[in-house]
Structure formats: C-alpha cells, structure tokens
Amino acid sequence: MAAGRQTHCTAFKGARCIAAGELGDVALKAKAAVDKGAQVMIFDDATSESIEVDFRGSAEDVLQRLAQPDGNPAVTEGPRGPGRPKLGVVAREITLLPRHWDWLSAQPGGASVALRKLVEEARRANGGKDRVRQSQEAAYRFMSVMAGNRPGFEEATRALFAGHRDRFDQLIAPWPKDVRHHARKLAADALDAQPRATGLLKS
C-alpha cells in the first residue's frame, strides 16, 4: 500500500521489532537494516497492511519518494464563492438509485450536506462496533503474516474474534516477544470490549 511519511507504522526484521513511529523515521531505520542485507517488513499500525518502501539510493532519496507516494494524486482547489468556507472536502463518485438522489436533493442543504450528516450519525452510532471490527482485522492480518505457522495460531484467531482476552493471551504466550506484544496491542480494542473472565467466580 502507498502511505505518507506521517503514517504510523512498525517495522520488523524477522520476529524482532526494529522501529516504530512515523513512516519517515521508521523507513530510515529499516533502510539501515536492509542495506546490511536484512529482510524487513513494515506494517501500518492502523490496518496492519504491508507498506512497500523503495530503499534504493540515499536516505534523502527514500524520504523524497515517501513525500509523494504513488496513487496519492495532488488535491487541487477549485474557485470558491464569496464567503464560502474552506471545508477540506474531497470529491469522489458514488452511485445511488434515483429515489435516493431524489431524497438527498430534497434535504436542507442538498445532497452533500445530507450525506455528511448521515455519515456522521452512522459513525457515532456504530463507533464501538467499528473499532472492534477494525481491531480484529488489523490483528488478524498481522498475525497471519508473522505467526501464521506458529503453534496456537488458529486457536488464537478464534479467541480474537470471540473476544476472549485471557484465552488469547494464553495462546500467544509462546510466540516471540515482539510479535506477541504487537499482536496484543492491535487486538486491544477487540479484546477489551469483553469483560475479563478471570476471577469473576471468586467470592
């Protein structure tokens, strides 16, 4: 995936974490390892998608390429009417049925305002569920790459999606420390949504 220099990420050399933070800083530390012949993987902290970095050339070359990643077109501003605020909106195409467009157009402020309100309402209503889902997906994606062949992976995956925190921690305990810690960090929202079972039956 393409990412900007300020994307937060984590780099692994084998099972060892060698850098974490903004992509610009992480890329430089990863380049030092790559220049010595190491194989390095960089993961987006939000999604665990692998970030591809071109390490050729000098450190300045690497940072310059990160400043304008492929697939990130520059945003150009069109003229605004007098007094119209700069909202930082992005134009993209969406497809709806005619009746949907009719309803949106009839709303106060028009289709764009109505869509933004609907999105914000949905985000507020589903914020907790979305965080759990995103946490599950990010943790699973990372675990599949870094621990897919390790003992307990399948069981740990089931515990992750079931929200069984203690079971998850128990199953990943034999994994390398850095892999274990990062998986637990990614899974935090998914697992912390469920109450801890340990000790609940004690009087």
Predicted regions and their residues:
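Short Lys/Arg-rich basic patches
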Residues: 68-95
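Short, mixed-charge low-complexity intrinsically disordered segments
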Residues: 37-67
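Short, positively charged interaction helices/loops
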Residues: 125-158
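Short aromatic-glycine-(Arg/Gly/Cys) micro-motifs in beta-strand/loop hairpins
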Residues: 1-13
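Short amphipathic alpha-helical segments
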Residues: 94-96, 104-123
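A short, exposed loop/beta-hairpin motif centered on an aromatic-Gly-Thr core
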Residues: 14-22
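Short, charge-rich amphipathic alpha-helical segments embedded
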Residues: 172-195
